From Swiss-Prot:
Keywords: Iron. Disulfide bonds: none annotated. Could be a mediator in iron transactions between iron acquisition and iron-requiring processes, such as synthesis and/or repair of Fe-S clusters in biosynthetic enzymes. This is Probable Fe(2+)-trafficking protein. The keyword Iron applies. Monomer. Belongs to the Fe(2+)-trafficking protein family. One of its GO terms (biological process) is cellular response to oxidative stress. One of its GO terms (molecular function) is iron ion binding.
Length: 87
């Protein structure tokens, strides 16, 4: 990945269904992280981060707990991809 080309790159954001500024880094490990990098805009990712904080606090999740980690990952997939796409 060339950092110089990552700045201000435009992608078609699957969250907003339009071209938006892409992320400058892969925000999550594995194939899911690459999918987010390629298909989710910086603005959509920031919306998820805010939503994630709300979910963790309301459901009193512990991010050191593997079950809670998997739950928040599932919430993230549903939020970002509207549960319409297979990973």
């Amino acid at each position: 990945m060339n950092k110089k080309n990552d700045i201000n790159r435009k992608i078609f954001c699957n969250f907003f269904k339009k071209y938006e500024e892409g992320l400058t880094y892969i925000p999550y490990p594995g194939l899911l992280g690459h999918k987010i990098y390629n298909e989710i805009s910086k603005l959509a990712w920031n919306k998820w981060i805010l939503q994630q904080t709300i979910i963790i606090n309301e459901k009193k999740m512990n991010m050191l707990n593997k079950n809670d980690q998997k739950k928040i990952e599932n919430y993230m997939i549903k939020f970002l991809f509207k549960n319409k796409q297979q990973l």
